[in-house]
Amino acid sequence: LMIGGKKVDYDFLKPLYSDLAIHQGEEFFPGYGAGHFVKMVHNGIEYGMMQSIAEGFAIMRKSKYKLHLRKIAEVYNHGSVIESSLINWMGNAFALFGDDLKGVSGRASHSGEGLWTTQVAHSLGISDKVIHESLKARERSQKKPSYQGKIIQALRNQFGGHNLKK
């Protein structure tokens, strides 16, 4: 939980936040909107990470090798430097839908946080090439569904229950 506002209000509600969050999974950020801002940037970072996963698995799928992508996700998630919840969910998606992600539309949608993050970055004069390009890739997949779009949409389904068919 990323909580903004007044410290006095946070302190009063901290027992509730502690009950809702995993151990050390909540933090206070001073100022109204600060918690939402931190969460927005979190989602922008997530866009870039998911796009990298999509690109990497698309490269492996198209290679001359007969690679089992689910097994790759599993080995990546056991001691690899890219071990993560996202890689774990990728393995789960391959287990459910196969390496071709059958039944997943290939149209990767977004809910706005990546766009808002790029808008803030631009207003601050900060380079955001990865986040910006990951947003553009999702927009392109709406017009031309792709395997990378399938990966993004499968991941979104795994962690947020997002629709696979859109």
Task: For each feature predicted by the language model, list its residue ranges.
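Acidic-glycine-rich active-site phosphate/pyrophosphate-binding loop
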Residues: 15-31, 94-95
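Helical "substrate-binding/catalytic lid" subdomain
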Residues: 3, 33-162
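Glycine-rich phosphate-binding loops that contact phosphosugars or nucleotide phosphates
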Residues: 1, 6, 18-19
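Short helix-loop capping/hinge motifs at secondary-structure junctions, enriched
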Residues: 7-12
